[in-house]
């Protein structure tokens, strides 16, 4: 770039920053660290599958799945992890179905959790926008998009046609809150339900409610499914759960994680650590016995999990080893890619 153009560009950049604030425009390569501020999901496997160690702050996240698949449990787990970091959380309960006793069992501090039960969809989304613009709330959960009923539909009669009202409402809200979420570094999680498209012969007939705007604006979309039951003898004590990262703007998508949700306790962290430690050869499995550093720690997965819960230092050590091995790769790849870009730039 010649000197005259360079001076003109610098003057334009200076004017933009003066008018709209510092950081309103920048060179993409100026911030080499590219560190993403995240909140853990409470699931070690899912944090790894997300590629950055959790859900990104300042972004929109969508979690969807069938009924009783663990959507609310996963979001309450995220809230509990956020509160452990000292963050302020809000729960917009459009379904009017939040159980504070269950939330407390999952580790949520219900005394510190802000909760709203709005009457209309517009009211719910306006509350989200006000909380976001305040800059004082770090995580907002909306449960659920399907329950965000437009005011016109509530005031009308059953049987009245309201085609596209919810989709238009969501589209307008996404345009309004996305920039505010980024500026305030607030994460907004939308829980969504599944519907079936009528007359689909080929492909997946499943779709989510609320139109297409949320699909486009969400940085992360998680598809959560119940794959089986967790039993103790004949009694069902939980569910096997699989989460697929359907969309990811901050790392590689299409990874998945499997974990157990134990009724009344939430995500089984010990179970995940056992599975991941065996898969990465930190724990040896011989027949039914599990061994760590040459010592037998349990016969069967259930006993091994129990042993880990009773020996917290070993459990923390294993978690650290798993995180170090599986979460350091993306950073190393990023550094290598930046180094390659610098070499190419030098060649030119």
Swiss-Prot record:
Job of this protein: Can catalyze the hydrolysis of ATP in the presence of single-stranded DNA, the ATP-dependent uptake of single-stranded DNA by duplex DNA, and the ATP-dependent hybridization of homologous single-stranded DNAs. It interacts with LexA causing its activation and leading to its autocatalytic cleavage.
GO annotation, cellular component aspect: cytosol
Residues annotated to bind ATP: 65-72
Superkingdom of origin organism: Bacteria
Ranges for region Disordered: 328-348
Keywords of the record: ATP-binding, Cytoplasm, DNA damage, DNA recombination, DNA repair, DNA-binding, Nucleotide-binding, Plasmid, SOS response
SMART domains: AAA (SM00382)
Compartments where located: Cytoplasm
Gene3D superfamilies in UniProt: P-loop containing nucleotide triphosphate hydrolases
InterPro entries on file: AAA+_ATPase, DNA_recomb/repair_RecA, DNA_recomb/repair_RecA_CS, P-loop_NTPase, RecA-like_C, RecA-like_N, RecA_ATP-bd, RecA_C_sf
Protein name: Protein RecA
Keyword field contains NADP: no
Family, similarity comment: Belongs to the RecA family.
Molecular functions (GO terms): ATP binding; ATP hydrolysis activity; ATP-dependent DNA damage sensor activity; damaged DNA binding; single-stranded DNA binding
Chief location of this protein within or outside the cell: cytoplasm
Any Gene Ontology biological process: SOS response
Gene name of the record: recA
Signal peptide: none
């Amino acid at each position: 770039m010649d000197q005259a153009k360079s001076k003109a560009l610098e003057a334009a950049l200076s004017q933009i920053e003066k008018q709209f604030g510092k950081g309103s425009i920048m060179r993409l390569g100026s911030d080499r660290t590219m560190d993403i501020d995240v909140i853990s999901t409470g699931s070690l496997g899912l944090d790894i599958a997300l590629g950055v160690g959790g859900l990104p702050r300042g972004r929109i996240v969508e979690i969807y799945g069938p009924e009783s698949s663990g959507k609310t449990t996963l979001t309450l787990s995220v809230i509990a992890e956020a509160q452990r970091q000292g963050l302020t959380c809000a729960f917009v309960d459009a379904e009017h179905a939040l159980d504070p006793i269950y939330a407390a069992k999952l580790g949520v501090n219900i005394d510190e959790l802000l909760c709203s039960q709005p009457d209309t969809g517009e009211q719910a989304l306006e509350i989200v926008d006000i909380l976001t613009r305040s800059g004082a709330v770090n995580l907002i959960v909306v449960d659920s998009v399907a329950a965000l009923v437009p005011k016109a539909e509530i005031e009308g009669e059953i049987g009245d046609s309201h085609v596209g009202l919810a989709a238009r409402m969501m589209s307008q809200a996404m345009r309004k809150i996305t920039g505010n979420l980024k500026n305030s570094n607030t994460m907004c999680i939308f829980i969504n339900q599944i519907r079936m498209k009528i007359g689909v012969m080929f492909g997946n007939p499943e779709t989510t409610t609320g139109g297409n705007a949320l699909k486009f604006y969400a940085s992360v979309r998680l598809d959560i499914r119940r794959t089986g039951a967790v039993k103790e003898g004949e009694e069902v004590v939980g569910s096997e759960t699989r989460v697929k990262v359907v969309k990811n703007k901050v790392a590689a998508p299409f990874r998945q994680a499997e974990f157990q949700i134990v009724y009344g306790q939430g995500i089984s962290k010990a179970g995940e650590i056992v599975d991941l430690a065996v898969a990465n050869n930190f724990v040896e499995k011989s027949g039914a016995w599990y061994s760590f550093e040459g010592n037998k720690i349990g016969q069967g997965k259930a006993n091994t999990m129990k042993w880990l819960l009773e020996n917290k230092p070993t459990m923390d050590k294993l978690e650290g080893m798993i995180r170090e091995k599986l979460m350091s790769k993306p950073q190393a790849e990023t550094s290598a890619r930046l180094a390659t870009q610098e070499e190419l730039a030098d060649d030119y």
